Amino acid sequence: MPFYCSPTALQRLYHPAGERAVAAAAEKFGTMFGVSSLGTVSIKELRKHKNPQVYQFYFHKDRGLNRAMLEEAKEAGVEVLMLTVDSITGGNRERDLRSGFSIPFSLTLGGIIQFAIKPLWGFNYLTHAKFCLPQLDDHVDMSDGALSIGRYLTEMLDPSMNWRDVEDMVKFWDGQFCLKGIMSVEDAKKAVDIGCSGIILSNHGGRQLDGSRSPFDQLAEIVDAVGDKIDIIMDSGVQRGTHVIKALSLGAKAVGGGRYYLFPLAAAGQRGVERALGLMKAEIIRGMRLMGCNSVNDLSKKNLKFRQR
């Protein structure tokens, strides 16, 4: 299936099974699954699944931390590294600021009220494995207080990251390496020059720079520029099988989604994710049949007609 589960953080916040449920559902559909640096299940455990996986990584100020985390990923058997380049500082997550969200959890008055209204939340929290961040536990000391995701992105990540840093990481990894968050032809060409094997056109679902251009609007020009030199994937805002078909028609090799499977995960765990992936697969197949296409190889720009602006 040309749709995959993009890496998302903190999946056990949505359901106790978290990444375990998503990985199992993706394996059932034979599609790719992304594991986040801020994941709540270890990459070592998730590697037992046979479907393709990528490890999404953030670039830290501490170069020793970067190297140590990459070494652990290699030892776990990770084959594809995905470096996120559009989140070198935290976005303005106003809801998180209002709620006081942090890791480990710190109860606020609002949180206590929510737990009282929904006692099953508290029961699940107390009866399931402790919430943690396995990819960071050995490297980040959170014993002195709560760490918000915004603080992690702003204080620990390196806003001075440059192309030389990325090139050094590509060489150190010495395997399949992709950049997530590419949004221009110039950057796509640079990714090719330094030896990346793939790029993901993404604006982080609009959660970082809310006024950024849609990745779909960038897709055609980037495919025209480097599509024959590097694998191009797209995510952000994908909700329908016809969205996937349009992106594939413009030259994307695959399309990812995050919130698309997170809400079903929250509602029904693995069954919910399987239901979402099943609906997506059915929509893609139905749309292609109605277009007279038997294979994704039949899709091309000829299938699309853009509005004149």
Predicted regions and their residues:
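Extended hydrophobic/aromatic segments used for targeting, binding, or gating
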Residues: 44, 192, 197-234
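Short hydrophobic/aromatic-enriched beta-strand-loop microsegments
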Residues: 52-58, 198-203, 254-258
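Alpha/beta catalytic cores of nucleotide-metabolism and tRNA/nucleoside-modifying enzymes
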Residues: 217-235, 239-309
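Electropositive phosphate-/nucleotide-binding environments in soluble metabolic enzymes
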Residues: 16, 20, 40, 63, ...
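Alpha-helix C-terminal capping segments
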Residues: 24-29, 48, 193-194, 223-226, ...
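Short acidic/polar active-site loop segments enriched in Thr and Asp
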Residues: 32, 79, 197, 253, ...
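Active-site entrance/lid segments in N-terminal catalytic domains of soluble metabolic enzymes
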Residues: 1-193, 205-208
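Structured core elements
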Residues: 4, 82, 178-179, 200, ...
